[in-house]
């Protein structure tokens, strides 16, 4: 059987695999949403082996999200919201072109938020299309990584998160609906914001080289964030205060790596010249005082940018202690707490690697310190992770 779609349910207790376009479960219930043909949705009761309802949409269904209150259907330029109890259409959202169906629905029934790329209005045009031409879209593809947070219970947009300077590639919301993780199409920086007030809480560095982010997942207690990408390394970031004096293991040197014998402050300055160049590494939001500090310290930033590669780590650490928070956070995102190295496969450097990277979906077990990884080449891996020391996870189970 060809594997066309794979996903975990909302609490990561079940894994759904199918040879159809889309398959989504509602927690551990018998309710399953199926996309059997591009525009047709079927809601099925697997216990009774009966079809509850079928819906047809004007264009291809790209994603389905559901919790105990809402069913969300994502098309390329529209999002449909349904009451999952009655299957009544509640609201239709017009979006910018979203061919990758980037969106996240909170599993929570109370904090029932939907996150998706902020629609970007098309600029006015003086060109008048002929009468027989189809109507032009009111939105264009996003050029930045802003996220709109929509309350699916009140049916209203409640906030905008200025997450990244480049377009988004992945979004994830935690179990309680209080945290939002974001990644841009560069994939070097992962950010975590509070929901619904959109305050930036954490900023992590996945690696120094751009890479497509395939999957992000919070653990059930929202203390860890797991991220998979087009590289063979799965990164696990710790949410919460980390003591800079802690001597944690570090992931191997490479595109997803860092220096292994330096302090967090020294590591920050070792990459200062590259991160100060802007792009996805620069924060796009912050307190007004932080922004003001950056403006008034522009000369100092320029000096450090030119000389950071030539100064010693001890001097860099001393200077770094005097920099305002708004400046230091530009090049000081936290590194991974733990990591996993997937086995070499056809998509990760093995024979036939020209086929392209293997896509992966990650989740963390709700009752054991384990990370579950499913890859598009049909492998299911389970890794143990040391929650006290971090470091590299160990492979304990493998299925194919």
UniProtKB/Swiss-Prot annotation:
Compartments where located: Preautophagosomal structure membrane; Vacuole membrane; Endosome membrane
Any Pfam family: PROPPIN
Compositional bias annotation for Polar residues: 270-284
Keyword Protein transport set for record: yes
SMART domains: WD40
GO cellular component terms, A-Z: endosome membrane; phagophore assembly site membrane; vacuolar membrane
Domain of life: Eukaryota
Protein family: Belongs to the WD repeat PROPPIN family.
Protein name, as recorded: Autophagy-related protein 18
Gene: ATG18
């Amino acid at each position: 059987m060809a594997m066309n779609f794979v996903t975990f349910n909302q609490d990561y207790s079940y894994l759904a695999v199918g040879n159809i376009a889309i398959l989504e479960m509602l927690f551990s219930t018998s309710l399953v949403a199926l996309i059997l043909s591009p525009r047709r949705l079927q809601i099925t009761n697997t216990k009774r082996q009966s079809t509850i309802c079928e819906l047809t949409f004007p264009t291809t269904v790209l994603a389905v999200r559901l919790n105990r209150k809402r069913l969300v259907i994502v098309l390329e330029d529209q999002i449909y919201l349904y009451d999952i109890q009655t299957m009544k259409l509640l609201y239709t959202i017009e979006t910018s072109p979203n061919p990758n169906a980037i969106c996240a629905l909170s599993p929570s029934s109370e904090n029932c938020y939907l996150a998706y790329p902020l629609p970007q209005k098309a600029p006015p045009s003086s060109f008048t299309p002929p009468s027989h031409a189809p109507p032009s879209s009111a939105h264009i593809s996003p050029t930045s990584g802003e996220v709109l947070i929509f309350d699916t219970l009140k049916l209203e947009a409640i906030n905008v998160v200025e997450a990244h300077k480049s377009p988004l590639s992945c979004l994830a919301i935690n179990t309680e609906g209080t945290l939002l993780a974001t990644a841009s199409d560069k994939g070097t920086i992962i950010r975590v914001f509070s929901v619904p007030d959109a305050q930036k809480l954490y900023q992590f560095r996945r690696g120094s080289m751009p890479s497509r982010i395939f999957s992000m997942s919070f653990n059930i207690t929202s203390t860890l964030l797991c991220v998979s990408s087009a590289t063979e390394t799965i990164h696990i970031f710790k949410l919460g205060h980390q003591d800079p004096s802690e001597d944690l293991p570090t992931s191997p040197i490479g595109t997803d790596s860092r220096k292994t014998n330096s302090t967090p402050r020294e590591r920050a300055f070792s990459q200062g010249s590259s991160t100060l160049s802007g792009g996805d590494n620069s924060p796009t939001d912050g307190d007004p005082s932080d922004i003001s500090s950056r403006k008034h310290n522009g000369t100092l930033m320029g000096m450090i940018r030119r000389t950071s590669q030539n100064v010693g780590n001890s001097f860099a650490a001393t200077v770094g202690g005097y920099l305002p928070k708004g400046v230091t956070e530009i090049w000081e995102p936290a590194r991974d707490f733990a990591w996993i190295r997937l086995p070499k496969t056809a998509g990760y450097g093995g024979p036939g690697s020209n086929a392209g990277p293997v896509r992966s979906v990650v989740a963390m077990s709700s009752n054991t310190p384990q990370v579950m990884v499913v890859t598009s080449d049909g492998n299911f891996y389970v890794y143990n992770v040391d929650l006290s020391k971090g470091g590299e996870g160990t492979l304990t189970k493998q299925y194919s």
